[in-house]
Amino acid sequence: MSNCKTIAICNQKGGVGKTTTTVNLGVGLAMQGKKVLLIDADTQGDLTTCLGWQDTDSLGITLATKLTDVINETMNGPMVGVLHHEEDVDLVPANLELSAMEFNLVNTISRETALRNYLSEMNGKYDYVLIDCMPSLDMVTINALSAADSVIIPVQAQYLPAKGMTQLVQTISRVKKRINPNLKIDGMIPTLVDSRTNVAKSTVEALRENFGNQIKMYRTY
């Protein structure tokens, strides 16, 4: 995985466009000829259903399966159960089974690095791995941050998420200090932007004013 870039799409607030950002970025990279793996790290399985697998409960192998295999040291091959989408991206799906991983990870030695250990088995199969994180800062999300080279933060441009952003940046800093010294923030992506409204304009401006000296803001409008 040395030439592969792993990006966590992360924000602990729901409804900010994480899944849409993950899909659009992944498909865009695939259109450029890159080999892309998407990882659904959300118990709701929104990325999985968005890509067409509606009955997530029927999936025999999911991210929970892969993490459990890492914990139990029973890996049967990293590509087993990986799904392929017609847009030429691969997917490690998720369903509600992932919710049990919080307890399982807390009680294992490699609790912060199980996902990193799984990805290390890929042996350079992909150019990019994009992780769609759940809207919380739980152990699965910590695993995503521990496995990532960088973080992209989608931010809904309809309110000022100052407190949530501060908490997220602090969590990323702690992971960088304690577990993943190479982790960095690529930038913020304003989502749901209606540039005709004063609310959107003022929110984007406030984000730029409060965090612009720390975090790059991508222009999406």
Q: Which residues make up each language-model segment?
A:
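P-loop NTP-binding core
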Residues: 1-221
